[in-house]
Amino acid sequence: MSSSERVPCDFCGERTAVLFCRADTAKLCLPCDQQVHTANLLSRKHVRSQICDNCGNEPVSVRCFTDNLILCQECDWDVHGSCSVSDAHVRSAVEGFSGCPSALELAALWGLDLEQGRKDEENQVPMMAMMMDNFGMQLDSWVLGSNELIVPSDTTFKKRGSCGSSCGRYKQVLCKQLEELLKSGVVGGDGDDGDRDRDCDREGACDGDGDGEAGEGLMVPEMSERLKWSRDVEEINGGGGGGVNQQWNATTTNPSGGQSSQIWDFNLGQSRGPEDTSRVEAAYVGKGAASSFTINNFVDHMNETCSTNVKGVKEIKKDDYKRSTSGQVQPTKSESNNRPITFGSEKGSNSSSDLHFTEHIAGTSCKTTRLVATKADLERLAQNRGDAMQRYKEKRKTRRYDKTIRYESRKARADTRLRVRGRFVKASEAPYP
């Protein structure tokens, strides 16, 4: 692919496209790639790689150091798969990158050496040495060598300058776009600060060795929310500061996270245990203040509700018993006193008693309405059944059982054929007339 056949960038249409995004199926230059893939966290996960030197339409997968070419899978098969001589070429697989690497990291990834990158590295070494000397630490050869053992993260890239240049035929185009990207300051001032800022945005926090502005930015809304919450609690408690302390004490009394039974007393303005309920209520009742009131806890409320339900069931059962025994001989006083009252059906009994008990719960008016409705339904059902029987009888009277002749020709032939004892005579055996 010659210089006239260079693929333009799909985003700007001016520069030469050097990267291929698999997710967007787009060919981009380096500045447009930085602009497109720094939009959100999802776009940073897109895998990009260089464009094939042969076809210019597919991402590269193989690098040939002998011919200084980067080829896609199909072009590599066409070049190195059909010729036995090309099998001796030195090749290696090419992996794409994701994230938003800086210009220096891209240059190190592709084996390019930028002069600006060298100056930055020379300036960083004495600065790091000065910082370590201030802390009383010395950098020895073992510490410097241990940097190679660190596992790189998603945004760090291994420097492959020792493997030689791997940028293909368009080394000058890559160098020009890298320098433009470095001068524009899209990534950051020296290339590293931009990545650190993006890492802070992605991870939500920065190291303590930084400027501290990101940490302060995260702490300011949290402290403002705490102060606002404290002011709200003070307003609820009448403007005093005791409410906040009591709230914090209630939170810190159970550090293990267990659920302790606590009841908030509106009269005292603090929380107390359930065992103090009866004592406090007794104190309020003993004072005899007409304007004072107490709030029962959940257990007392449930007990009162259950006792009310039991009383209601007892009254209903008593009325039911009176109605059932109104038409019978009343038992003696001793028998009625000794007779136990049961609220549930005994073991082995059928559901007729439950149904009877449920029917008696309804009032007399409800029973009368139910009987009237049932009688009307039965009459309507009988009338509908009678009408259906009448229609059936009328239809039966008009029913005809006439025989239908399907084929007229067969009927005429059957009428003219000779019969012997009701059976047809074969044509071969029939006598001639």
From Swiss-Prot:
Polar residues: which segments have biased composition? Answer: 324-340
Highest taxon, organism lineage: Eukaryota
The residues that cross the membrane are: none
Q: Please state every residue range assigned to the domain named CCT.
A: 385-427
| SMART domains tied to this protein | BBOX
GO BP annotations of the record are:
regulation of DNA-templated transcription
Please state where this protein is localized. Nucleus
Cite the residue spans of the region called Disordered.
Answer: 319-353
Q: Which GO terms describe its molecular function?
A: DNA-binding transcription factor activity; zinc ion binding
Start-end of B box-type zinc fingers: 9-51, 52-94
**Stretch forming the signal peptide:** none
Residue stretches in coiled coil:
374-398
Q: Which cysteines are joined by disulfide bonds?
A: none
Transcription as a keyword? no
- Where is Zn(2+) 1 annotated to bind? C9, C12, C32, H37
Q: Keywords for this entry? A: Coiled coil, Metal-binding, Nucleus, Repeat, Zinc, Zinc-finger
GO CC terms on record?
Answer: nucleus
Instruction: Summarize where Zn(2+) 2 binds, as residue positions.
Output: C52, C55, C75, H80
InterPro entries given in the database record: CCT_domain, CONSTANS-like_Bbox1, Znf_B-box
CDD domains per the UniProt record, alphabetical:
Bbox1_BBX-like (cd19821)
Say if the entry is tagged with keyword Coiled coil: yes
Concerning PANTHER family, the annotation shows: ZINC FINGER PROTEIN CONSTANS-LIKE 10, ZINC FINGER PROTEIN CONSTANS-LIKE 14-RELATED
In the record, the note on similarity to other proteins reads: Belongs to the CONSTANS family.
UniProt protein name: Zinc finger protein CONSTANS-LIKE 15
Gene source species: Arabidopsis thaliana
The organism's lineage? Eukaryota, Viridiplantae, Streptophyta, Embryophyta, Tracheophyta
Gene (name only): COL15
